[in-house]
């Protein structure tokens, strides 16, 4: 359920950076069922402009189901999502489907994100910032998994979003590519003051990037800064493979 309710919270600092007084999104008591099976149980959190939140959890723990609620794909939930204003939300799904029967260049895919939106963000600046100029004339089907993720990130950026939701964005990358991707995310947030919510099942790769980590296994088990999370007894009991 959408609400335009304004939320009043004190100014705080996250990762040493001054954050907006008001969160741009507040998730309040979200519960979701698939049939009789509860996949999300009473999840609540908020995010401010310029903040990076990682939703960490095991496979099958409800991460993807939660982000599908946040971006409006799944609307059959209990609870409320509050916005201080109606935001532009860009979504990067975990599995991008490439249709081999409809060839598409990288440039065409990026331009398609601009059509009918009146977007003012300079497409060329985004292409240079994400460093995909050399990929523009190539077919999407020819790209590696890591290259596709960079292109999809650029596509999100040209929408001039307030919030980008990334579902397991680095699951197909090696360690070096993961680190480079997370560094790029941090730079984009600093430059454009956008908010990021991303899912992962690997804490170690998000340590240098996230302001906050929310550990979920249907319900929220613990949350805090990456440093606080790794010291949490609840985290170690639920996600021992990440310790």
UniProtKB/Swiss-Prot annotation:
Any one Gene Ontology MF annotation carried by this entry is: ABC-type zinc transporter activity
What residue stretches are annotated with the ABC transporter domain?
A: 25-242
Q: Which key words are in the record?
A: ATP-binding, Cell inner membrane, Cell membrane, Ion transport, Membrane, Nucleotide-binding, Translocase, Transport, Zinc, Zinc transport
Give the membrane topology, semicolon-separated if more than one.
Answer: Peripheral membrane protein
Q: Does the keyword Nucleotide-binding apply?
A: yes
Residues reported in the UniProt entry to bind ATP: 57-64
The record's PROSITE patterns line, in alphabetical order, gives:
ABC_TRANSPORTER_1 (PS00211), ABC_TRANSPORTER_2 (PS50893), ZNUC (PS51298)
Q: Can you tell me which family this protein belongs to?
A: Belongs to the ABC transporter superfamily. Zinc importer (TC 3.A.1.15.5) family.
Protein name per Swiss-Prot or TrEMBL: Zinc import ATP-binding protein ZnuC
């Amino acid at each position: 359920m959408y609400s335009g309710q304004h939320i009043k919270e004190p100014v705080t600092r996250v990762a040493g950076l001054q954050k907006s007084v008001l969160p741009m999104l507040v998730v309040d008591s979200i519960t979701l069922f698939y049939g009789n099976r509860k996949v999300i149980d009473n999840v609540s959190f908020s995010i401010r402009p310029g903040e990076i939140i990682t939703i960490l959890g095991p496979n099958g723990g409800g991460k993807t189901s939660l982000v599908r609620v946040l971006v409006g794909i799944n609307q059959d939930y209990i609870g409320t999502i509050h916005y201080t204003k109606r935001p532009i939300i860009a979504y990067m799904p975990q599995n991008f489907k490439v249709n081999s029967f409809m060839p598409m260049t990288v440039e065409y895919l990026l331009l398609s994100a601009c059509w009918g939106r009146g977007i003012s963000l300079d497409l060329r600046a985004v292409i240079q910032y994400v460093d995909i100029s050399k990929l523009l004339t190539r077919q999407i089907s020819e790209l590696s998994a890591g290259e596709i993720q960079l292109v999809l990130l650029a596509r999100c950026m040209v929408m001039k979003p307030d919030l980008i939701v990334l579902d397991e964005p680095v699951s197909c990358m090696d360690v070096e590519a993961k680190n480079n991707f997370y560094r790029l995310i941090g730079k984009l947030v600093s430059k454009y003051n956008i908010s990021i919510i991303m899912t992962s099942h690997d804490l170690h790769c998000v340590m240098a990037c996230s302001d906050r980590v929310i550990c979920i296994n249907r319900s929220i088990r613990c949350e805090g800064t990456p440093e606080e999370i790794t010291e949490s007894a609840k985290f170690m009991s639920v996600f021992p493979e990440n310790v």
